[in-house]
Amino acid sequence: MDPREKTACFTGHRPEKLFPSDTETAAQVLEIRRSLHARILQAVDDGYTTFLCGMAQGVDLWAGDMVLSLQESVRQLKLVAVLPYPASVRGWPPEWQRSYLRVLKFCTEAVLICPGYQPDCYHQRNRYMVDHASRLIGVWREGCPGGTQYTVQYAEKKGLELDLILLP
């Protein structure tokens, strides 16, 4: 069996793009997280056992945390960190750095895409995840340019099943 059949990957905007007008509320974050958790649970119910996480602030790290919490009851789940380059967290707010390190510590495996920063290292990371999965789980504001839009479009082109939370 092709391992991609049981592998899903994540994409989603960073916090500042999730709530572009600084109107983030705890209720909005909770609703997105609930929807994301439901989609991960559905993937597990559908037989997915490996989850690829790009380890970015926001949706990626939320999803990574959720998979790790599910590992307590579903032992065969694997979380794979797909890192664009080693120092990708430099300059992040401390709370996101802590979240990154916590998730990375408990990942089953880590894949390093580039040995150092390169202009397209984030796109390379996103392509790697799509090329190694059969389902994309994400949070997307359609028309919002950036890595999430690129990843959704690339996944469509590659024929992945899309399970997206669409934001207004």
Model-predicted segments: where are they?
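Acidic/glycine-enriched connector segments
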Residues: 1-168
